[in-house]
Regions:
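Short, charged low-complexity linear motifs
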Residues: 167-177
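Catalytic DNA-binding helix-loop module of base-excision-repair DNA glycosylases/AP lyases
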Residues: 44-49, 100, 104-106, 115-159, ...
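Alpha-helix N-cap/helix-start motif
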Residues: 58, 144-148, 166, 182
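Substrate-binding clefts and substrate-entry loops adjacent to catalytic sites
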Residues: 89, 160-164
Length: 218
């Protein structure tokens, strides 16, 4: 019985990996808000600003912000009114302005101006929750898995999880995928979600991806 259960689980892992590759093939190449920055500080701040804001908006705003405040020391000393002017295009810019300034102060005061790379230390920073910490860590090469709306929706549709709570989805996906794939899941699923913005189109492709006959063509 145990052997049979193990075989079934291994098959689920293999199918899920093939599905992940299919999602990648059905996605456009695009820069995400957390990618292609010069420092861990810039990656973290852009990740904080990207919450509930389109990447196409976040990226140019972050570029403008980092031209004015290149590091944590400079942003920590910034006036909130000046930061608000710069990041106004992002959603909830007032709250985010306060958060990224306070976050920068914490980095300067508590971490010698170096962004911590430990999950438990990251979530102590203002504006950094579980998702933001995991997305940041996965971007810098850590074995982490950030669960956002794209990851939640797609993983439920494909049967990778039956849970709706992000932290439970994270646990399920970490069980289903080998550790070396954890930091690839979020960017692949986000790109797929951003490529197929129509819910009908997205669901149609996901139904095909879920079918065994389609999977076997990989």
């Amino acid at each position: 019985m145990i052997k049979k259960t193990l075989v079934v689980f291994i098959m689920r892992q293999e199918i899920a990996l093939k599905q992940l590759k299919l999602l990648s093939k059905n996605s456009k190449e695009m820069r995400l808000a957390v990618e292609n920055w010069k420092s861990n500080f810039q990656i973290l701040i852009s990740t904080i600003m990207s919450a509930r804001t389109r990447d196409e908006v976040t990226i140019p705003v972050a570029e403008k912000l980092f031209k004015k405040y290149q590091n944590s020391k400079k942003l920590a000393a910034a006036k909130i009114s000046e930061v608000e002017k710069v990041i106004k295009p992002v959603n909830f810019y007032r709250n985010k302005s306060r958060n990224i300034i306070e976050c920068s102060k914490q980095i300067v005061q508590n971490y010698n101006s170096n962004v911590p790379t430990d999950f438990n230390e990251l979530i102590k920073l203002k504006g950094v929750g579980r998702k933001t910490a995991n997305v940041f860590l996965s971007e810098i090469g850590g074995k982490a898995l950030g669960v956002d709306t794209h990851v939640s929706y797609i993983s439920q549709k494909l049967g990778w999880t039956k849970n709706k709570a992000p932290h439970k989805i994270e646990v399920d996906l970490k069980k289903l995928f080998a550790k070396r794939y954890w930091n690839r899941i979020n960017p692949i699923l986000v790109r797929f979600g951003k490529t197929h913005t129509s819910r009908r189109e997205k669901d149609k492709i996901l139904r095909e991806v879920k079918k065994e006959r389609f999977i076997n063509k990989c």
